[in-house]
Amino acid sequence: MAVKVVIPTPLRQFAGKKDSVDIDAKTVGEALAGLTSQFGDLRKHLFNEEGKLRSFVNVYVNDEDIRFLQKDQTPVNDSDVISIVPSIAGGSLIRCICS
Amino acid sequence: MPRERDPGLIPPSKNSAFQTNEQNDPKGAWATNQDLLVNIKGEGKVKMPTLTSDPTLQLSNDEILRYSRHLIMPEVAMEGQLKLKQAKVLCIGAGGLGTPLALYLAAAGVGTLGMVDFDVVDFTNLQRQVIHDTDDVGRPKLESARDTIRDINPNVEVIPYETHLNSENALEIFKDYDIVADGTDNFPTRYLVNDACVLLGKPNVYGSIFRFEGQASVFYAKEGPCYRCLYPEPPPPGLVPSCAEGGVLGVLPGIVGSIQALETIKLILGKGKPLIGRLLLFDALNLKFRELKLRKNPECPVCGTHPTVTKLIDYEQFCGIRGEEHVPETHVPEITAKEVKQMMDEKKPFVLVDVREPHEYQICRIDGAKLIPLGDVPKRMHELNSADDIVVHCRSGVRSARAVEFLMKSGFKKIHNLKGGVLAWARDVDPSMPSY
């Protein structure tokens, strides 16, 4: 079962410049693990040293924040879309998520 | 503290209808009108703030003609137009997002427009900040913005705050306004604006952009989540701005800032369904709008049930910005552009490495430089010989400092960072080279 993971602009450089990736997964945790095993550079931008999702990165299943669902245990099926939504500062000077 | 107002700027009137109204209304300018309960999709009722109206306030015949396309719509009409005239909106930033915000709010007849910015117009702004003209380059943005607004609608009172917004002045500046529209470009100010709005109970109309992507929402802690409910913390220290990853399509802030102007006007009118509790995502490349649900976080440090942030804090420190710029782990030896030119003139052997991106290399380059984009340095460092003298450069010197640091850790010793990058080269050595 492949779920679509939407990659935001600032992170596309670490995901082969793709705007979305299809991953076989039953939960959000599996999908993100699959994504970061495919694109190793993404890992440190999504997770901290303890392997927890960084607090400036939110993950949504369709339009719901997984923090208010079952977090990484949130089940997904192939019609679902997972979105990674990092905070962006915006404007002229960009403080971006870069290595 | 806000600077003293320039006597050349329009002074704020002492007897604005809004202030008179505020004095008469102990509840303040925002009163909850039970008639304006708006149903948010499956989320129950949201109480819309609405300005109380001053019965003595009227439009002149000129204003009636000017706003006639508003007045003939029942959703605005005379009542709404008078609300707009009484409204006081504070725009944080007179740049990419601040441009459409200020232009459309002024044109729509928002009576008082505060603007906070301390920047000066430069040529790189003109690609998107259409409130400023070519002739304005070198002028303070607020002076330039004020002139444009005055040309569009002389009825608008512009109150400039040519200052760096900080924890000491934010509450004092914000307190006189009904709505704050956040068009800033950095995390410390985002969190400062959010916290000040939560503490004062004011709506924060949020917009943010990155390259081809935008976000917009209305953070109004009385009725829904705040920015910290969405993002409790900013990215950690060490994540510095990089020109390679920056850039923004000129039209994008026009779209996102216009959405902010629209939401601001809806809040003033008390009409429609505001972006409270919703995050709008806009992808310009694929022309897609998406919407995510935002929920109030009961554990939010500023608007939750047990807040730990009860006054403004040091936001530079909170965001790990302070002191970050010049604290590399190892000392990075530097060399000036003039010294590099001298080495070239004296035909001293050295290798010049350019760590910018290929599309930057096409804009301008120093003759003889070898292009190895920063991201490729680890896998291509075998192309360099640690026995050679090496000078590394980028656009401004930030990325090349990282490359030098990395190469030194890998055993390179005869290596220098070109201080100020190609910008310094263009300034001090080759004035015919374009800057970007």
How would you describe each model-predicted region?
Chain B
Residues V116-N153:
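Glycine-rich phosphate-binding loop and adjoining beta1-alpha1-beta2 segment
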Residues K47-T52, N153-I259, L269-K271, N286-K288, ...:
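E1/E1-like adenylate-forming module used to activate ubiquitin-like modifiers
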Residues G80-A106, T112-D117:
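Glycine-rich adenosine-cofactor-binding loop
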Residues P49-L51, D147, A284-P298, V302-F350, ...:
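Rhodanese-like catalytic fold shared by cysteine-dependent sulfurtransferases
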Residues G96-T99, V110, V120-V121, T184-P188, ...:
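Residue-level detector of alpha-helix initiation sites
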Residues V46-L90, L312-D314, F318-P328:
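N-terminal charged helix/coil linker that caps or initiates catalytic domains
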Residues L84, I173-D178, L384-N385:
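A short, aliphatic-rich alpha-helical micro-motif
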